[in-house]
Amino acid sequence: MVTPEDLECLKRIALMGGLNTPVFLKTISLGSELGFSPQTASRRLRSLEQQGFISRTLGTDGQQVTITHGGEDALRQEYCDYYRLFGRQEKSLMLNGTVQSGLGEGAYYMSLQPYADQFQRILGFTPFPGTLNIRLLPGATLQRKRLSSAEWKVVQGFESEGRTFGDVRCLPCFIRDVPCGIIIPGRTHYPEELIEVVSPEGLRKRFSLKDGDEVTIEVTL
C-alpha cells in the first residue's frame, strides 16, 4: 500500500507535469519542495519505482521521471476518496429507479481487458464483471435529461480478433456511497428510462437487491 509520504511525492511529480511527459528533477530540489532531505527524497523515488508508480532514467546531474498508469491510478484513488468526503457538497442530481434484469451481456463486455483498463483509469476501479440495470421511475426520466450537460468520459473502442468494439460513454456516480459509473454504449440507442451501471463489486449481492427493488443514483453535476 502506498504510504502518505510516497503519495505526496507522487503528487508533486504530477504537478510538475509528470503525468503527461517525463520531467527532469534533482533530489535536492524535490526534497526542498517536500520538506525532505535529499536522501529521503531519493528513498521516496526508489520506493515509487519499486511499486511501479514511476519510471526513471538516471543521468549525471539528475533524472527523468514519468508517472506510470499504476501511479496515475493511485492518484485517482486518492481523488475519489476526497471526492467522497467533499464533492457531495456540490450540486447533485438524484435519479430513482428499480432494479431489473438485463440480457447478461455486461459480464462479457466488462471482462474485456481494453475496456477494463480504461474504466480503471477513468473511474478509479476495475469493474465487476456485470452491470446493474435500472429502470427509472416516471418522475426521474425528466431529471435524466439533465445528464446531457454533465462531463461524460469516453472509453475508447478497439478491435480484437476481427471484431470491432465501439466507444462507451461513462459518467461517475454513486449508489449508496459506492463509487460507480453510468455507461452508454456508443452504438446503442438506450430508452431514456433505462440506466446501466458499472461498479467495483456486485451491487445485487452487496445490498441484497432483487428485481423491483428501488435504488437511487447520485450524480454530481
From Swiss-Prot:
Pathway annotation: Cofactor biosynthesis; FMN biosynthesis; FMN from riboflavin (CTP route): step 1/1
The protein, known as: Riboflavin kinase
Cofactor descriptive note: Binds 1 Mg(2+) ion per subunit.
InterPro entries attached to this UniProt entry: HTH_MarR-typ, RibK_CTP-dep, Riboflavin_kinase_archaeal, Riboflavin_kinase_CTP-dep, Riboflavin_kinase_dom_sf, WH-like_DNA-bd_sf, WH_DNA-bd_sf
Binding of CDP, residues: G102, L103, G104, E105, G106, A107, E201, G202, L203, R204
Pfam families with a match to the protein in the record: CTP-dep_RFKase, MarR
One GO BP annotation of this record: riboflavin biosynthetic process
GO molecular function, one term: nucleotide binding
Keyword Transcription regulation attributed: no
Keywords: Flavoprotein, FMN, Kinase, Magnesium, Metal-binding, Nucleotide-binding, Transferase
Role description: Catalyzes the CTP-dependent phosphorylation of riboflavin (vitamin B2) to form flavin mononucleotide (FMN).
The enzyme's E.C. designation: 2.7.1.161
Region (Riboflavin kinase): 93-221
Keyword Transferase annotated: yes
Family: Belongs to the archaeal riboflavin kinase family.
Cofactor(s) of this protein: Mg(2+)
Class of this enzyme: transferase
Gene3D superfamilies the UniProt entry points to: Riboflavin kinase-like, Winged helix-like DNA-binding domain superfamily/Winged helix DNA-binding domain
Binding-site positions, FMN: T188, E196
